[in-house]
């Protein structure tokens, strides 16, 4: 199976276009003001103009109000939503777009029950648990905590980079991988060489 690749946290149009040319499957835009990768609606509109056909534009939200999400959707052509907070299944379903739900994995968390609760999601994005931080920490978690029989596609995140993504895929065999800080020079500033090396690492695992 070919592992899908999402790069999250774009803030520059040229870097998003470079990622698309390298072959990523999805690009993530962050709508969460505390994040250094947060983009305004105007920035997001410009970034989406660099998204070619068949590349998914993903909007990331963290405990946003319903109106905040709808305001973005009225103006930005997103095709998938990603929720990173304490959103309920009913909340996530109400926007009429497919969504993935992020889970901060730690010992004792029942991922099978979580997948049952969020059966309407297109997948679960598994990230590292860091107290008080909703994601984008650059920390990895214990992959053995992932049940082999999860009923939803797994999007593996959390501390992935060009040096460990091949190992991660060989261990977990996820549907997709998600990276942000692992391919950056600084927060929100993507590194072309790191993105290319990350994609090569994914392809090496898929052979």
PLM segments and residue spans:
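Conserved N-terminal beta1-alpha1 strand-loop-helix module at the mouth
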Residues: 1-207
């Amino acid at each position: 199976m070919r592992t899908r690749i999402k790069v999250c946290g774009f803030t520059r149009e040229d870097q998003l276009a470079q990622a698309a040319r390298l072959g990523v499957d999805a690009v993530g835009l962050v709508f969460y003001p505390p994040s250094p990768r947060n983009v305004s609606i105007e920035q997001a509109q410009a970034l989406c103009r660099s998204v070619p056909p068949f590349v998914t534009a993903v909007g990331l939200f963290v405990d946003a109000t319903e109106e905040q999400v709808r305001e973005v959707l009225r103006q930005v052509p997103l095709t998938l939503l990603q929720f990173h907070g304490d959103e309920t299944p009913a909340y996530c379903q109400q926007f009429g777009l497919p969504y993935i739900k992020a889970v901060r994995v730690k010992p004792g968390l029942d991922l099978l029950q979580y997948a049952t609760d969020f059966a309407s999601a297109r997948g679960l994005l598994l990230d590292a648990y860091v107290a008080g931080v909703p994601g984008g920490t650059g920390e990895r978690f214990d992959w053995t905590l992932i049940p082999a029989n999860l009923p939803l596609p797994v999007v593996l995140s959390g501390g992935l980079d060009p040096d460990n993504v091949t190992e991660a895929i060989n261990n977990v065999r996820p549907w997709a991988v998600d990276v942000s800080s692992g391919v950056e020079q600084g927060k929100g500033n993507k590194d072309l060489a790191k993105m290319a090396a990350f994609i090569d690492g994914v392809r090496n695992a898929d052979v």
